[in-house]
């Protein structure tokens, strides 16, 4: 290589490094877009907006919500995966996009594992509800009741391929249960079906269920996760009754495009964790039946990989075909 050519390449690299460093020093100098794969008005959208306010206070720039709902959350994820990696476009990611979509869509237009984790935000527990007159009062009794009545019972969930559906199917496989699945479009339909006795039991998010549990309209038999709930510590988990693989809660975390500079990532992580652990934000989560979640980013990625590994076999077993 000619000396002049080598010197020019060294100078170019130095300029790029200097530009990257200068960008990190001044970041953020304009508003940040938070791409949310859910429609406006739901609990996830509200959580995003609350977190965005806390982040903006820390960063000194607005964090603007852009709602991009779509099947599998693909549109929102693609928007961020293909965005300029400068920290100004970030993603609210969830279990749907990261642990279900890879098994349900053959040719994703991006690589999920290249999205960089900023920080986790929360989990949204899913509880198994029954009417007050249902014979079982907890998971232990429910399991025995299903075994005593094989093929005679059914359960509702808030959709095919959701964490509720997959978690219950894993529980069925783990414990040898014979109970039919009836999917509904969201919690509202599931609650109506349970009340109308279309289904015997139903998995519903705690956000939608907690007021009805406290009012005695329904009783909670179990929760689909590893640990007991802060708000309802008497409710058994599916893991503690022998279904060790069924703890698949709904979760959300923030992510950045691949290649985002480390210094920018550190600023985003610091602002996000500051917002998500603020007492007012934690109180907001608890009041809405949602649990704060604050593992390290390394533990977050291990958790996502574990969920991805567990969801694949059960999706195949129940016959869901990739599109």
Swiss-Prot record:
* Keyword terms of this UniProt record: Periplasm, Signal
Per its UniProt record, what InterPro entries does this chain match? Answer: BUG (IPR005064), Bug_dom1 (IPR042100)
Task: Answer whether the UniProt record assigns the keyword Signal to this protein.
Answer: yes
Where is the protein found, in the record's own terms?
Periplasm
Q: What is its main location?
A: periplasm
Instruction: State if Signal is listed as a keyword.
Output: yes
Q: Which family does it belong to?
A: Belongs to the UPF0065 (bug) family.
| UniProt xrefs under PANTHER family | BLR1237 PROTEIN, TRICARBOXYLATE-BINDING PROTEIN
Annotated protein name in UniProt: UPF0065 protein BP0148
């Amino acid at each position: 290589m000619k000396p002049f050519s080598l010197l020019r390449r060294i100078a170019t690299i130095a300029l790029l490094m200097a530009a990257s460093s200068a960008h990190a020093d001044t970041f953020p100098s304009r508003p940040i877009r938070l791409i949310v794969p859910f429609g406006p008005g739901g609990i996830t959208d509200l959580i995003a907006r609350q977190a965005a306010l806390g982040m903006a206070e820390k960063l000194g720039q607005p964090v603007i919500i852009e709602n991009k709902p779509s099947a599998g959350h693909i549109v929102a994820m693609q928007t961020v995966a293909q965005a300029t990696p400068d920290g100004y476009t970030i993603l609210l990611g969830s279990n749907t996009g990261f642990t279900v979509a890879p098994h349900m869509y053959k040719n994703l237009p991006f690589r999920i594992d290249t999205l960089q984790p900023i920080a986790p935000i929360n989990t949204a527990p899913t509880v198994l509800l029954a009417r007050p007159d249902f014979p079982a009062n907890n998971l232990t009794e429910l399991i025995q009741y299903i075994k005593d009545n094989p093929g005679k019972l059914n359960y509702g969930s808030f959709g095919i391929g959701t964490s509720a559906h997959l978690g219950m199917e894993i529980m069925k496989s783990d414990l040898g249960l014979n109970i039919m699945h009836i999917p509904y479009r969201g919690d509202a339909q599931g609650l109506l079906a349970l009340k109308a006795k279309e289904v015997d039991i139903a998995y519903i998010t705690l956000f939608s269920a907690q007021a009805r549990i406290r009012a005695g309209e329904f009783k909670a038999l179990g929760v689909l996760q590893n640990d007991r709930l802060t708000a309802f510590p008497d409710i058994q988990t599916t893991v503690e009754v022998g279904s060790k693989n069924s703890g698949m809660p709904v979760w959300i975390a923030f992510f950045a495009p691949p290649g985002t500079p480390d210094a920018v990532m550190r600023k985003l992580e610091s602002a996000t964790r500051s917002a998500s652990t603020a007492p007012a934000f934690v109180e907001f989560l608890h009041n809405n039946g949602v649990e704060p979640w604050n593992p390290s980013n390394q533990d977050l990625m291990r958790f996502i990989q574990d969920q991805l590994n567990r969801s694949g076999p059960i999706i195949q077993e129940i016959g869901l075909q990739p599109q």
